[in-house]
Amino acid sequence: MTNSHGEKRCTRYKLQKTVRERGISPVSRAIQEFEEGQMVHIDIDPSVQKGMPNPKFQGSTGKVIGQRGRSYVLEVRSGNAMKEVFSLPQHLKPQKY
């Protein structure tokens, strides 16, 4: 049988919550707002499948450059290239200085 090439391949542990984090995520993560130019961390919430960025961006940091509907457009460095990543606020955390 050939290996799958889906978007969620190789994410067995990456998209897994710890025992204490199980269940529905708090509403405050869904209604948080970010401003343009603000730095945010991508922290994927596996209990919310909609608006999930590609798992290869898990743990990376980017700058908010805009908004499309309810989701945010982020500028993230991937190697030497700058990529645009779309994500719902459930999968983002503000960077603390």
Curated annotation (Swiss-Prot):
Pfam families, A to Z: Ribosomal_L21e
Q: Which domain of life is it from?
A: Archaea
Q: List the molecular function annotations (GO) for this entry.
A: structural constituent of ribosome
Q: Does the keyword Ribonucleoprotein apply?
A: yes
* One BP term from GO: translation
Which cellular component, as a GO term, is one annotated location? cytosolic large ribosomal subunit
Instruction: Cite the entry's keywords alphabetically.
Output: Ribonucleoprotein, Ribosomal protein
What protein family does this chain belong to? Belongs to the eukaryotic ribosomal protein eL21 family.
Q: What is this protein called?
A: Large ribosomal subunit protein eL21
